């Protein structure tokens, strides 16, 4: 049975469970449940603190897990990223009092508060910056006001919390993060016979990603305009073209990027396409 770690709370939790549900896996109904078995798919889910997931997977206690890229790298364990999952985007940045800092070189000899000390120490060492790292478990933005630190390094989603604390972002991003699927480094699941189950999980999650990013577009168009229309809707490999009762016309079906749907529909209509319909993709395998 495949053993999978899932975030039990925070910004990763709901989105991770929703994605697994879309991929066809049973998920818990009560947030107090810590373990959930899906017998139909021979899989067991363990709901854990996002920060601990990389540790469990890196030690081989669990086969795979969903966590943040920032948490994976900060944990410094033998676990590797298998698949970016496209949700919970964030950026790990430096921030300090407005006007005090403009670049990382100004952090020499300063005190830096963070919840990601492993990640931060590596970044500073790579750039030859000698600063004192103060590890905090949360509310990092308060450390400057309380005199614990001169600046901070923290995960930023909107930046509103920093502004409210009288701070601004400076320097280049330390890391761009999102939710990722991870496994123990180099394991492949071969040791405990879960390689096939991991492959199926990855394929299903990839299908969800594609289904979220694309829609299915159908339209009718004259035969002599098919090549121009296909240039607008090339699909992943090639559009499907089917004959209609009127031999001068054909029906075309293609996957198109969801965010470009209306622009493509407008251009197809101007080209001469009619009966343009768009359908959502519930699931797919590419």
Swiss-Prot record:
Pathway, per record: Amino-acid biosynthesis; L-histidine biosynthesis; L-histidine from 5-phospho-alpha-D-ribose 1-diphosphate: step 1/9
Pfam families on file: HisG, HisG_C
GO molecular function, one term: ATP binding
UniProt-listed GO biological process terms: L-histidine biosynthetic process
UniProt GO cellular component terms: cytoplasm
Recorded superkingdom: Bacteria
EC class: transferase
Reaction catalysis annotation: 1-(5-phospho-beta-D-ribosyl)-ATP + diphosphate = 5-phospho-alpha-D-ribose 1-diphosphate + ATP
Keywords for the protein's UniProt record, in alphabetical order: Amino-acid biosynthesis, ATP-binding, Cytoplasm, Glycosyltransferase, Histidine biosynthesis, Magnesium, Metal-binding, Nucleotide-binding, Transferase
Cofactor(s) of this protein: Mg(2+)
Gene3D superfamilies according to UniProt: 3.30.70.120, Periplasmic binding protein-like II (3.40.190.10)
Catalytic activity, EC: 2.4.2.17
Localization (cell): Cytoplasm
Activity regulation note: Feedback inhibited by histidine.
The family this protein is said to belong to: Belongs to the ATP phosphoribosyltransferase family. Long subfamily.
HAMAP family, sorted: HisG_Long (MF_00079)
PANTHER family per UniProt: ATP PHOSPHORIBOSYLTRANSFERASE (PTHR21403:SF8), ATP PHOSPHORIBOSYLTRANSFERASE ATP-PRTASE (PTHR21403)
Record's function text: Catalyzes the condensation of ATP and 5-phosphoribose 1-diphosphate to form N'-(5'-phosphoribosyl)-ATP (PR-ATP). Has a crucial role in the pathway because the rate of histidine biosynthesis seems to be controlled primarily by regulation of HisG enzymatic activity.
Protein name in the entry: ATP phosphoribosyltransferase
Species, as recorded: Paenarthrobacter aurescens (strain TC1)
């Amino acid at each position: 049975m495949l053993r999978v770690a899932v975030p039990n709370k925070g910004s990763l939790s709901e989105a991770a469970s929703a994605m697994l549900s879309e991929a066809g896996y049973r998920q818990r109904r009560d947030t107090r449940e810590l373990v959930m078995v899906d017998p139909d798919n021979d899989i067991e889910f363990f709901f854990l603190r996002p920060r601990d997931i990389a540790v469990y997977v890196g030690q081989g206690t669990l086969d795979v897990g969903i966590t943040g890229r920032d948490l994976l790298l900060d944990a410094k364990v033998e676990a590797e990223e298998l698949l970016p999952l496209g949700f919970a985007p964030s950026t790990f940045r430096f921030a300090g009092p407005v006007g005090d800092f403009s670049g990382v070189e100004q952090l020499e000899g300063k005190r830096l508060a963070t919840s990601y000390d492993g990640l931060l120490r590596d970044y500073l060492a790579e750039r030859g910056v000698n600063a004192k790292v103060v590890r905090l478990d949360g509310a990092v933005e308060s450390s400057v006001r309380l005199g614990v630190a001169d600046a901070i390094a923290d995960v930023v989603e909107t930046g509103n919390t920093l502004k409210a604390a009288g701070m601004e972002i400076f320097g280049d991003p330390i890391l761009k993060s999102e939710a990722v699927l991870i496994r123990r480094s180099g394991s492949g699941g071969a040791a405990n016979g879960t390689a096939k189950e991991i492959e199926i999980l990855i394929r299903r999650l990839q299908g969800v990603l594609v289904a979220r990013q694309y829609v299915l577009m159908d339209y009718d168009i004259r035969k002599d305009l098919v090549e121009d229309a296909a240039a607008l809707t090339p699909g992943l490999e090639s559009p499907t073209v089917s004959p209609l009762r009127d031999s001068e016309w054909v029906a075309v079906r293609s996957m198109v990027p969801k965010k470009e749907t209306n622009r493509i529909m407008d251009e197809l209509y101007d080209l001469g396409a009619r009966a343009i319909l768009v359908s959502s993709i519930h699931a797919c395998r590419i």
